[in-house]
Amino acid sequence: NRICELCVPILYGSPKVAAYYRKVLNIENFSLNTIREPGEANGKRSNIINCVDDNVKVDLGKETPESDQATMVALKYALDQLDRDEIDVLTLAPQGPNAFFTEEAGSLVEYLGKRYNTTDIMSILVSEKIKMGFVTEQVKLRDVPHQVTQKNIFKKLTLLDDTLRQDFTILKPKIAVLGLNPQVNCGQNGDEEVNVIIPAIERAREEGIMAIGPFSAERFFSERMYEKFDAVLAMYYDQGVVAFKSVDEEGAACYVAGLPVICSMSLTDPHYDIVGQNMGDEQGLRNALYLAMDVCVHREQNIELQKNPLPHYDIAANSNESDLNVEQIEGVKEELED
């Protein structure tokens, strides 16, 4: 009921499969409103658009090629309607590891990047305690050093800074940058820190981005330094996601930044071992939906502000903005050292 008060939910899939699961779970006094297009949705009910073959085979608790194919069909159908502004946001339920593996892409983020013809894209893990972006997504560990370049780090810092400002309404984001090597912060920076990461951070600062680091991942999280920052940029996915889940796994969600559309997903695993037992925790999916709705509201607010901007005030002509930025950075460093 609360979700219907905040939005008009539309499920993309098969009404027949949904009815089968409802029967398995013995859910009474609930039915989905089958519609053909978003304009027919009932604001007081949960709606479903049939975009998958009704004869699709259902294997409880198993990911199959048929289920993965149905997932991609539903995703493409929903994205088409999202592109036409027929819906406002898209939130994905937990999926199996091969759901978005295609000939064109090996992950959802890669697929979305190809669909929208952009490499300036990043998944951001979001919880109440921490936000985390990544220089590299889910790539093989041996490929990480080749992708951790000054250019890529600067691009990700810029994207993360822009996203925090526009989609999360954080006016002056403070971003912590993790090192690639474990000995960072012990006076033993590796070649990657000295020649790649630090120069990228310095370039970002020249552009007005409050980036600080590099930090050792172990020390950064064990000493709870993340509490001083608005977001963290990890060098690779496993470096960040394990630490992220140790800080705040419950109800965390993922937001795909850098797209013209709003897309979020739950970080919860599909937990095939308990399928059909009515034991799943829906909070992760619920939070992913709330996250997408919040971003939608923030973007609409930004559009309105741009329509009626305040009179321009030339900061550069009236103050030394770079000095202010340096003072803020030094202040954060002093807090971390205390």
Please describe what each predicted stretch is.
Residues 1-338:
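Anion-binding alpha/beta catalytic cores of soluble intermediary-metabolism enzymes, centered on
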